[in-house]
Design a protein with these regions (language model features):
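Conserved glycine-rich cofactor-binding loop
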Residues: 17-19
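Substrate-binding pocket helix/loop in short-chain dehydrogenase/reductase
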Residues: 97-98, 102-110
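Alpha-helical segment proximal to the catalytic Tyr-Lys
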Residues: 126-127, 168-172
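Residue(s) in the substrate-gating loop at a strand-loop-helix junction
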Residues: 139
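Active-site loop immediately N-terminal to the catalytic Tyr-X3-Lys motif
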Residues: 99, 131, 144-150, 172-173
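The beta1-alpha1 cofactor-binding region of Rossmann-like NAD(H)/NADP(H)-dependent oxidoreductases
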Residues: 61-72, 103
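Active-site helix of classical SDR
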Residues: 121, 155, 163
Length: 182
């Protein structure tokens, strides 16, 4: 028996075309959500939206590109008006010792894992309903020491702190903020 916990709810899964984001998107769809998924690669995104089925829309968005985030906000507002759940799973992993990290590698990971998340939330905030939820994809690396991945660990610790700060900021707005750290 299907419970349809998200029937009539508008759910945006950023990074919903692969990995944990795709799994979450499928689960939201199975529970009846009006689903929006994003990703960088148009072909993959379209294929995964078809695979998910249901009421799934797909928009290209690279969270490291501020203009693409702004475009996403406009598209979501035009098609859906508001969102009930913002699930951000877009992220990257990179390992290596501190001596192997380049400035480009640092910027790429921080831009994808933390900066893009922050500015996606900032852009979507006016579209968040009351009540609504924001779920951020963290990592156990943001809580525990992980050898050979200092930049990744730092970015995911930032996600954890961002979630805690926003949870405190948004409590009076009816927006719940959580981080999931597999």
């Amino acid at each position: 028996m299907t419970r349809n916990l998200f029937e009539g709810k508008n759910v945006l899964v950023v990074g919903g075309n692969s990995g944990i984001g795709l799994a979450a998107a499928k689960a939201f769809s199975q529970e009846g959500a009006n689903l929006i998924i994003t990703g960088r690669n148009v072909e993959t995104l379209t294929s995964k939206a078809d695979e998910i089925g249901g009421r799934t829309s797909a928009y290209q968005c690279d969270v490291t590109d501020m203009e693409q985030i702004k475009d996403l906000v406009v598209k979501v507002e035009l098609e859906f008006g508001y969102i009930d759940v913002l699930f951000i799973s877009a992220g990257q992993y990179s390992s290596g010792s501190i001596n192997s990290v380049t400035e480009e590698n640092w910027d790429w990971l921080m831009d994808t894992n933390l900066k893009g998340m922050f500015f996606t939330i900032q852009g979507m905030l006016p579209l968040m309903g009351n009540p609504s939820s924001i779920v951020l994809m963290g990592s156990i690396a943001g809580r525990l020491a992980v050898a050979e991945s200092p930049v990744y660990a730092a970015s995911k610790a930032g996600v954890r702190s961002l979630a805690r700060s926003l949870a405190a900021d948004f409590v009076t707005k009816g927006i719940r903020v959580n981080v999931v750290s597999p």
